[in-house]
């Protein structure tokens, strides 16, 4: 498989999103489905402001999506590729344990 130099940089930037444990916690909460900030904060044991900040980073990078229904906003994984990446990564980590 051959890629361009731009794709290498884009891929490196993509994987940097997974280098923050707070973002990983949030993504694992979202594996179970769409949630509001308050619920994500509770499940990830983080403050709502910290969760909101990380959600903005993930949303700008198209890792998650935001859905508004009236005044309610929920967040979910953008697609099954993100779910698969997380599942493969955790399987790899647990492989040697």
Model-found features: residue ranges?
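Conserved segment of winged-helix/HTH DNA-binding domains
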Residues: 15, 74-97
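Short, intrinsically disordered or compositionally biased N-terminal tails of bacterial proteins
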Residues: 1-9
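Alpha-helical residues within the helix-turn-helix
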Residues: 42, 53, 59-60
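Generic helix-packing signal
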Residues: 48, 53-54, 93
């Amino acid at each position: 498989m051959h890629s361009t130099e731009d794709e290498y940089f884009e891929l490196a930037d993509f994987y940097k999103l997974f280098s923050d444990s707070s973002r990983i916690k949030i993504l694992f909460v979202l594996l179970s489905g769409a949630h509001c900030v308050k619920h994500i904060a509770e499940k990830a044991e983080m403050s709502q402001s910290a969760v909101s900040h990380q959600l903005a980073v993930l949303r700008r990078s198209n890792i998650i999506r935001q859905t508004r229904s009236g005044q309610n906003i929920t967040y979910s994984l953008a697609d099954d590729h993100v779910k698969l990446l997380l599942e493969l990564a955790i399987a790899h980590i647990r492989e040697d344990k």
